[in-house]
A protein has these predicted regions:
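Patatin-like phospholipase
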Residues: 1-202
């Protein structure tokens, strides 16, 4: 089923259909992001139409990658909730987002630390928080999530070192053993606390 049709059927954060007599089957290994999109829509009421994110009270843009051609896509206008959802569509974890003729996933594939985008927006001071994972060793590549995360890390390294140099303040919290799939409340609270500690250490 094309993703444009698949998205119409997404109902839950984790969409796991029952297929008669065959038990539970996960569609294409993807997690539906409909509930996340609904949450973003509630949080961004008033910014659902075609708006320039650069004119928001706090100017904003985010980065996605187009699976059709592999190119970086800077999202700085349109539907704010949809842009946010597109930029966090981690390959192999969340389903891609169809936007016009593009199939968008997490921008980490093309630009995993987009300080250059902030610089282009006119930022005077850049505080970069790096939550990328260290590359895993062979014995640590055991699950689909770990393999996809490793591939994403490789693909997003093209600009990585140069973009670190653009930071006025560079913060890298300790995120071990957490990953992009760490969504529990306990995981999130722990990561926030580690981020605060890393920032205060600067």
């Amino acid at each position: 089923m094309p993703f444009s049709e698949k998205e119409k059927d997404e109902k839950y954060l984790v969409s796991i259909p029952m297929i008669g007599g065959k038990g539970i089957q996960v569609p294409s290994g993807f997690i539906s992001g409909q509930n996340i999109y609904s949450l973003f829509s509630e949080l961004t009421i008033g910014y659902h139409d075609s708006v320039s994110f650069l004119n928001l009270p706090i100017p904003f843009s985010c980065v996605a990658a187009n699976l059709v051609n592999g190119k970086e896509v800077i999202l700085d206008q349109g539907n704010l909730a949809m842009a946010m959802r597109s930029s966090m569509a981690i390959p192999g974890v969340f389903s891609p987002v169809v936007m016009d003729t593009m199939l968008l996933v997490d921008g980490g594939i093309a630009n995993n630390f987009p300080t250059d985008v902030g610089k282009a927006m006119g930022a005077d001071i850049i505080i970069g928080v790096d939550v990328s994972s260290e590359l895993r060793k062979m014995n640590e590549l055991n699950t689909a999530i770990e393999i996809v995360d490793q591939l994403t890390s490789f693909m997003g390294m093209a600009k990585y070192e140069d973009n670190i140099k653009l930071c006025d303040i560079y913060i890298k919290p300790d995120i071990v053993p957490y990953s992009a799939a760490s969504f529990s409340a306990v995981d999130i609270d722990t990561l926030i606390l580690r981020g605060e500690r890393a920032a205060r250490a600067q």
